[in-house]
Amino acid sequence: VDFAGSDTAHRPMAGRVTSAKIVIAGGFGVGKTTLVGSVSEITPLTTEAIMASAGVGVDDTRQVPGKTTTTVAMDFGRITIDRDLILYLFGTPGQTRFWFMWDELVRGAIGAVVLVDTRRLADCFAAIDFFEHRRLPYLVAINCFDGMQYHNAQDVRDALAISSEVPVVSCDARNRESTKHVLISLVEYVLSMRRSRAVAPA
């Protein structure tokens, strides 16, 4: 697939390297920076800052005790899925006052991962609405904090009222292989959607 804009439904020919942009989104403190850092093969670029008094009354830290930093622009990482596919990861800031940056961050992306904490599902509604409004393919990844999954995938799907076609997977954002599985699942979903469009009657 030429992710730069082609509707071709096949993987690149041997020797040709394709790169694609993926956005990692979700609520405040859900683990986006951790996810990018766990899987990136380069030292991830992070734009975290110490949480300041400006966040008092705005950022709800009750469910993320001990969190003292926040992403103020983006996180950036890179992973080579196989010899002909490189993914560039862009993590969005989770705080609502930084959402004005999202339009630029998603420009050129093939899809998005919406990372969720099942204890705070409402925090991801805005991200889902954003991607659905822009018709950008996305999947929902349940971040299993402390190795625990508080709700199963179908319960989360029902609570978010998302299409049955949208993948819902579980992951541990701290674990490279777990995170890699999420990214591969998204790429496969995007490819499936493009194949479906290619064979659909005009």
Name each model feature, range by range.
Residues G29, Q95, R119-A122, F145-Q149, ...:
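Conserved nucleotide-binding/hydrolysis micro-motifs of P-loop NTPases
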Residues A25, T92-P93, D172-A173:
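A short hydrophobic beta-strand->loop->alpha-helix junction that borders the nucleotide-binding pocket
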Residues D2-V64, R78-D82, I86-Y88:
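Conserved G1/Walker A P-loop phosphate-binding module
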